[in-house]
Amino acid sequence: MTRSGDEAQLMTGVTGDLAGTELGLTPSLTKNAGVPTTDQPQKGKDFTSDQEVRWCPGCGDYVILNTIRNFLPELGLRRENIVFISGIGCSSRFPYYLETYGFHSIHGRAPAIATGLALAREDLSVWVVTGDGDALSIGGNHLIHALRRNINVTILLFNNRIYGLTKGQYSPTSEVGKVTKSTPMGSLDHPFNPVSLALGAEATFVGRALDSDRNGLTEVLRAAAQHRGAALVEILQDCPIFNDGSFDALRKEGAEERVIKVRHGEPIVFGANGEYCVVKSGFGLEVAKTADVAIDEIIVHDAQVDDPAYAFALSRLSDQNLDHTVLGIFRHISRPTYDDAARSQVVAARNAAPSGTAALQSLLHGRDTWTVD
């Protein structure tokens, strides 16, 4: 099969125009560029739906819900242009309780649905609410590909280290040795570190917060909501029925020696009196006593390092016992988003392509042809 000279020239022109297009690779827009705003004052109650909240008493989801409700007015966006998409699990009831649009979708597929919505509707602020089971088990592939593509969505991953809705089985973040209904002799699985996973997928924004730390949670959410691109926020939260006290070590006596709060541009020191710090150790990082190191050896947190290796090393400081758990923003860099590039590519193709049969034939023929004798 051969292609006529006119068709070959036509196809070359189309693809040449596409190759020379910037395809939206200008990562200077804000998260909600193109999303309609409102000049009407908003309060937390404006984002409260008429649905009865059906979580167990004491569930950490209540704190997160109230924090989100009180935070959303800061964005100044029309409620009709905010969408929360969830999968399956206790956390996935979230869209019912917000006076915005939402999807309560299927297990693990919220990032895929959010990807399509972000591509199709630039006028929407798209959020994903998921849990450790929903996101990291059946939804693992959807999550990492949304992150690596840098889709313009904000993903909230509620991590209670247990399957709550299905009544207490171990999850992908449960500790080794976790005794549950499905692991009566203790879990053998090595758990995922959600922050490490997101950084491995090269997410452009990765943060972690504790449900009971309202100020810290709001600070991370505020930054994630303004970040254009894929933003993942892991929220450590309690399940009082099936995994009660899972994160008590980060709340009770001695928490100052376990929690490391990081802020961009500030030295990483912690402890009741700043007696501990983070320093370099070989190819990674380690905790040292502040009195034992020179001041210039203490790491100054830089969330804007392009290489994710530094943020990854920071995420590896903690273990399943929660010693040296880092809270705050690990990584916050700028990179072109997939949805911006895709929309620009569509515009370029429409502008470059001729109409009629010739255009269809040029696409069917492709760029390379062979003659078969």
Curated annotation (Swiss-Prot):
Q: How does it assemble?
A: KG oxidoreductase (KOR) is composed of KorA and KorB subunits.
Q: What class of enzyme is it?
A: oxidoreductase
Q: What is its EC number?
A: 1.2.7.3
- Pathway membership: Carbohydrate metabolism; tricarboxylic acid cycle
Q: What InterPro entries does this protein map onto? A: 2-oxoacid:Fd_oxidoreductase, THDP-binding, TPP_enzyme_TPP-bd
Q: Kindly provide the name given to this protein in its UniProt entry.
A: 2-oxoglutarate oxidoreductase subunit KorB
Gene disruption phenotype: CoA-dependent KG oxidoreductase activity is absent in a mutant strain deleted for both genes korA and korB, and this strain is impaired for aerobic growth in the absence of sufficient amounts of CO(2). Inhibition of the glyoxylate shunt or exclusion of exogenous fatty acids alleviates this growth defect. Simultaneous disruption of korAB and kgd results in strict dependence upon the glyoxylate shunt for growth.
* Misc: Is extremely stable under aerobic conditions.
Q: What does this protein do?
A: Component of KG oxidoreductase (KOR) that catalyzes the CoA-dependent oxidative decarboxylation of 2-oxoglutarate (alpha-ketoglutarate, KG) to succinyl-CoA. Methyl viologen can act as electron acceptor in vitro; the physiologic electron acceptor is unknown. Is involved in the alternative TCA pathway that functions concurrently with fatty acid beta-oxidation.
